[in-house]
Amino acid sequence: MMRRAASQTVASLRGYASPVNPALRLPVVASLISPGRFASSAAASPLVCRDAIVKAVTAKAVFDEKIVESLANTFVNGLEKSSYPLNFSQEEMVAHVQGLLTAEARFRMGDSFEYVHENRRNAFYICRNEPQKKLRMLRKMAQFVSRNEDPKLGSNTHHYVSEDRNFAIYTASIEPFIENTNTEMHVDPENPALPTQTAERQLTERQKEIVRGLLHRQLSSVFPVFHIEEVSKGQVSFTMATMLERTNYVTWLLSIFQEIAGAEVMTGVSYSFANRVQIYGFEIRGAAAEQIAERASLVGLLPSRPFNALTRLHEAGALSCEETVFIDAAVIFAMYFTPSPTTDDYRHLKAILATEPNGVNRLNNLRSSLTQEVMSERYTGAVIALYPEFVKLIYEDFRLGSKPERRAAIAEKIMHRLREDDRAEYDRTLFMSFLKFNEVIIKHNFCKTEKAALAFRLNPEFLKELEFPRVPHGVFLFAGGQWRGFHIRFTDIARGGVRMIISKERNYRKNKRSVFQENYNLAYTQLLKNKDIPEGGSKGTILISSSYLNKFDEVRCRHIFLQYVDAMLDLIIPGEKGVVDRLKAEEIIFLGPDENTAGTFPAAGALYSKGRGYKAWKSFTTGKDPELGGIPHDVYGMTTHSVRAYVRCIYEKLGLRESEMRKFQTGGPDGDLGSNEVLRSKEKMVGMVDISASLHDPQGIDREELARLAHHRLPLREFRRSKLSPEGFLVLTEDRNVKLPDGTLVEDGSRMRDEFHFLKYSDADVFVPCGGRPRSVTLENVGKFLKVPDADGESMMEGKYANLSPEQLKFTIIVEGANLFISQDARVALEKCGVTLIKDASANKGGVTSSSLEVFAGLCLSDEEHAKYMSAKSATDAPEFYKRYVQEILQRIEENAKLEFNAIWREWEKDPNQPKTLIADALSRKNVQMRANVLSSDIFQNRDLVRYVMDQYALKTLKEVVPVDVMLERVPKNYQHAICAMWLASRYVYQTGVDSNEFDFFRYMTEVYANAAKSAK
């Protein structure tokens, strides 16, 4: 399908309307490099005063005049036919000749022929015209311009090869952008593309026209866009625009062009613009436009780390750019799915520890920690560097479409060689993982010319071999230039957010190792949580390289999010050109907001998918702006509404008054859950912590001040200290050596923040986690939640502290708003000590309920109806339909929460020794299994039943606009079936409990069929 920009329909986002046709005659026009093209005679360029250059260099009395004259002539003769004389002053040329003389002197003394000169704003490099020498200098130049972090300054680079092909020179400069003027260059007036002073001076009108076109296309593109023109027979001009990265692309571009047999890069330039776009221009001899386009599309996907083994192999020519990009993705796969080394000792210990609580889990944790270095990507790269020929075989198998016979032959060849070389068993396992990658890929976009990231749809059955408790329905692996990601869903129709993980350097390695496991856990939790909606559980993750970004940057993060979206769309839009598809089935994906992907991101994703021509764009993302039909969770407190329903149900059962309870909360007033928990609760807040600060007041934190912060979404650091009682305190994360009112010295504010939920200042009746990293409380540290000396998680699990009084508990009630804040075993340990605990999958499902009903409206309403009824400027300025629909969603959230809570409580009253956590899991598992059974049955042949359930499920306000019979025509059949399966399963399980049997289900369905028949009359 032809790609369209998110803001408007365009034929293509590249420099030509479609992939280049070999028969297409390219016009002979001006290139970006020179005012016309490489001139055929010196007449096209101003005369260079050789005598003046010789005189100026000789005057420095460093080199003999004859040598100066000889090399000056060599220099001028080599470059005077290029645009070099146009771009440099006489003084600069003198410096360059001086550099050439220095390089020659080094060479005559037995050193390498090269010269490097750098100061604060300018740099000059010279070397032999040899691939490795040029790459070395290019890397230095790229590092030089990448050091500039001043947003008011831009960079320029120039690259020339002498006419006799003997030497190459590189120059770089850092300088201000021009003042803002009303020129046609500014395709986006709100963010003008101001060029550097050098670019403004050097670019001709034709070149500016090319640049304007690229800048315009870059506005709606999430990958590099380029323009290719033939400037003369056998000579091609290549111009590319991309979002400004921390590392300059010029090295990678040169390296991939050098792969083309007979091709030579003659000149190159790059200019940065004030709107964070970088322009690159190259003039290449001996290459066809098709060859250049093919390779240029991969430039943003090459490994970007200078000392990465794959980068070195590519630059040395041992691997092509296609092989390098492919094996980089295969290494990502291998990192997460290569089985951990096992030995007889491991198997023996596993058998012994199998009878101990949590024993095998602890053994596996120990194995993981001991094998981290061996299973690292660095080690994998080192092994690949020894056997690049294996990569070529594995890539060829992938390129041709992997076949079992070919994989077996390759595996035999690899195993034979590695045994000969006496390599470790793990090395053999690594290469087998690469072949496994080929085997499990059932859809990919590797062959697409236009792609923001690599996307692979994997057959998830291979996870059975890796001891995952449940095999997902679908797994996607994504490999971007500066990020990697996954998407996991446990059912065909599934829902979940996309989490963007941004790390400091010290945490990046840990996050990199755990990202798939975290994604899996979050998706599985979502599956259990989504028992009240048609969609099963899913989750997406985007892990950004810490060397690229270590804190949230909205522009860059949105750009990466849209790259993730673009790659996903490649695989779910039917009939996409260049996509290799062995799945042969249409998939529906729903993406919700999560950490670092809320705000404007969902709307951007929806509009982008609309621009790509995705029919279900209205439902593709949730959490969109109200103007696009989104129902923002934070504005209406959807998730909090569910959490509060559970808290109040507990108070009602235990006979407690909300206003008399003391509460502690993680997650501050600047977040969705944190702010709404503040605004919608009535307890006395005694402690709160967020990323910015730790706050405590035993008299109760001032409610009005908390409300002020929550309304304005401000972090705790903005809390006015004047609102604290004498015993209260506010410690900022960056504070050091702070003395608290009770005399305690806090040496490190960030450490206090991380441990605050364990300190005495957070003691309360109720704990509601509304933020924090997963597994903040585990079996290893949960003992700190007891006011008992030396309490530990293992003893808690064994029931040693089963008869504690409420005074011995740090918290008597815990309702998890944040996902996975407390590990499963820690939850059970707390309940065995008398804590009333409701886990995340039950408590915080309000958000997904809202998102699901938002999606359902998008599927039911036509585009015109959607714009009329679901487009709201704000919560107050919204259509009456929208307001009523939101209120009905809130009622549905509360209804679902009470249904599940009462089911959990009834089961617990039957056996008070059974943890509510395990009861909730049992109910969820039964629900999920019942849903799967219904989906695999022929129950949907009864159209009266389907119509009845759809009528029960749809909210009244929606049915007033779209009658049920119209819904049945518009909503996809598999989504209708998912609604029926969910509705039947959840109500059955909530009514009959964990121990119900087939006879109970028969009675239940008899009643449902009777109601359906009655409704059909």
Task: Indicate where each model-derived feature is located.
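Non-transmembrane, aqueous-exposed alpha-helical and coiled segments at domain scale
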Residues: 550, 648-662, 679, 697-711, ...
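N-terminal mitochondrial targeting presequence
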Residues: 1-44
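Terminal amphipathic helices with adjacent charged low-complexity linkers/tails
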Residues: 280-283, 551, 555-558, 584-585, ...
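Non-catalytic interaction/regulatory segments
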Residues: 25-33, 42-481, 486, 501-512, ...
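Hydrophobic, well-ordered beta-alpha structural blocks that scaffold small-molecule cofactor pockets
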Residues: 617, 627-706
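Conserved phosphate/anionic-ligand binding catalytic regions in large, soluble enzymes, centered on
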Residues: 468-496, 527-552, 591-600, 625-643, ...
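Gly-rich Lys/Arg/Thr-decorated short loops/hinges at beta-loop-alpha junctions or inter-strand turns
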Residues: 234-236, 496-503, 616-632, 720-739, ...
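Glycine/serine-rich phosphate-binding loop and adjoining beta1-alpha1 elements at the start
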Residues: 485, 519-659
